[in-house]
Regions:
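Bacterial N-terminal signal peptides that target proteins for export
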Residues: 2-12
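Outer-membrane beta-barrel initiation region
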Residues: 26-102, 108, 126, 136, ...
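Transmembrane beta-strand segments that form the barrel wall of outer-membrane beta-barrel proteins
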Residues: 48-60, 71, 80-112, 124, ...
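C-terminal outer-membrane beta-barrel translocator/porin domains of Gram-negative envelope proteins
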Residues: 46, 99, 122-166, 200-383, ...
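Outer-membrane beta-barrel strand-turn architecture
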Residues: 76-79, 114-118, 169-173, 226-228, ...
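Outer-membrane beta-barrel "beta-signal"
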Residues: 219-222, 427-428, 432-434, 448-460
Length: 460
């Protein structure tokens, strides 16, 4: 009975996390979709129909389990303007959906958009959410399914309770400029009793204690996308740039290594930026070479709060190195700890980070695969095929602190670490179209064993 219940639970969570990926696994399918599920379903699609919405948060983690959103949504239009209102409550599956303040949240929003592809949009929202510290490393489905199946959570989390307003100018269907202002209370979240299919008796990695307090942030964001496809691109650019100006009062400081933060401050004001630059190039009808560069970190003002710090390592960045692995006595340029015992959970502590990724992709063909793809596999009206592509990749990256130059961890404001101090790896894999299997081996630290991992999405 327990095995049956576990299988059913695994099936539902798998669909809840994977459906956005399956929906883009191949070109548009001619079979009509289930319109009932668009309005009411655990993995509701982007329906424009008003009514009652029941949907998952498209993720799974050691703090919430599976967040379930339920409430009314309203969509209307007048000429070129479209209006949206949603009133969603959140119940989380941690501690078997226990009804308490940790398991309850909300997300209320109202917005207006003028123009379909080119136009502008105004949105306001009020929320009580669990948010990841570093969302840029790994997509939600990959992070969620790793936590659900193998009890590995590749993110850290904190609570965001407040409101924000966003103004967006859409230059095209996928390129935009936006400004955002928010007033929020940030708080630490604890690791909870959350189910996983395998290794369910193992202890979760602790969720790090972050800085609690009230913060105001102003963000300017640019998203420039010239790719020919947003899921499986073969040509074009994707440029994501963000500047954040934040200020706040810390009422309860989180835990950090002595070198990363000698003494916490109660009042702070900071400037922070993040640039994610990706280029996709087709070399031939069946081969591509793609590159990614990520630069982020402190720009000015006081030190960054722990919610806004950086790290590298693990399947989302440098998979040849284990995620948040602690090696006693070793200066860690992935999390920026000085070699002593790190705080519980080994949190991200770097004030700046740099990551470079390069991959070569070559599509594979065989008569067997052509036979298997004769009729697409269908799941809820979505057809997809197996499209194997061989992948070879290299990665290099590290984080560092800003301050008085010292050793290999602290650098001055205008300095950049030598490449010889970066963590590097190489790897091979096969991308089947709906998921990929890879193996990565550390180069800069030859004693590290090879890591085998799966990805739902392409690496970048």
């Amino acid at each position: 009975m327990m095995t049956t219940a576990r299988t059913i639970r695994a099936f539902w969570v798998l669909l809840a996390c994977m459906t956005p990926r399956l929906a883009h696994a191949q070109k548009t399918d001619t079979l009509g979709t289930d319109t009932t599920a668009e309005r009411l379903g655990l993995w509701a699609r982007s329906s424009r129909t008003s009514g009652l919405l029941l949907t998952s948060g498209k993720t799974y983690n050691r703090v919430e389990g599976l967040p379930v959103y339920i409430g009314p949504v309203f969509h209307d239009s007048s000429g070129k303007a479209a209006f949206n209102v949603s009133v969603l409550g959140i119940i989380r599956s941690a501690d078997t959906f226990h009804w308490d303040h940790e398991n309850l949240g909300h997300n209320l929003g109202a917005g207006m958009r003028v123009g379909r592809e080119r136009g502008y949009e105004l949105d306001i929202s009020s929320y009580d959410l669990v948010a990841p510290v570093e969302k840029w490393q790994l997509p939600d489905p990959d992070a969620g399914l790793a936590a659900f199946f193998v009890r590995r959570d590749f993110r850290d989390y904190f609570n965001r309770h407040g409101a924000k307003a966003i103004g967006t100018f859409h230059m095209s269907s996928r390129s935009s400029l936006a400004v955002e202002w928010s007033d929020e209370r940030w708080a630490a979240e604890r690791t909870r009793s959350v189910f996983s299919v395998f290794r369910n008796g193992k202890t979760w990695r602790a969720n790090p204690l972050v800085d609690a307090g009230r913060f105001h942030t102003a963000v300017a964001r640019a998203n420039i996308d010239t790719r020919n496809d947003d899921i499986n691109p073969s040509t074009g650019w994707l440029i994501l740039a963000e500047y954040e100006r934040g200020s706040g009062r810390v009422t309860d400081a989180g835990l950090a290594s002595p070198l990363a933060r000698p003494a916490p401050v109660s009042q702070l004001a900071y400037g922070r930026a993040l640039l994610d630059l990706r280029r996709y190039n087709r070399l031939s009808p069946n081969s591509w070479i793609n590159a990614r560069l990520v630069l982020g970190g402190w720009l000015h003002g006081d030190e960054l709060p722990l919610e806004r710090r950086f790290s590298v390592g693990g399947v989302g960045t440098i998979p040849g190195f284990d995620f948040r692995k602690y090696q006693p006595g070793t200066v860690d340029v992935s999390q920026c700890s000085d070699g002593g015992q790190p705080p519980p959970g080994n949190p991200a502590q770097c004030e700046r980070v740099a990551l470079a990724q390069l991959e070569y992709r070559s599509e594979l063909h065989s008569s067997l695969l052509d036979f298997l793809n004769w009729r697409p596999i269908r799941l809820r009206g979505i057809g997809f095929t197996v499209q194997p592509t061989a992948v070879a990749f290299v990665d290099a990256g590290r984080g560092w602190l800003v301050g008085q130059p010292s050793g290999t961890l602290e650098y001055s404001t205008h300095s950049f670490p030598r490449f010889g101090t970066f963590r590097t790896d190489v790897g091979l894999g096969i991308d089947l179209g709906i998921f990929g299997i890879y193996v990565a081996k550390a180069v800069s630290s030859s004693k590290e064993p090879a890591n085998v991992f799966l990805r739902l999405h392409r690496r970048f």
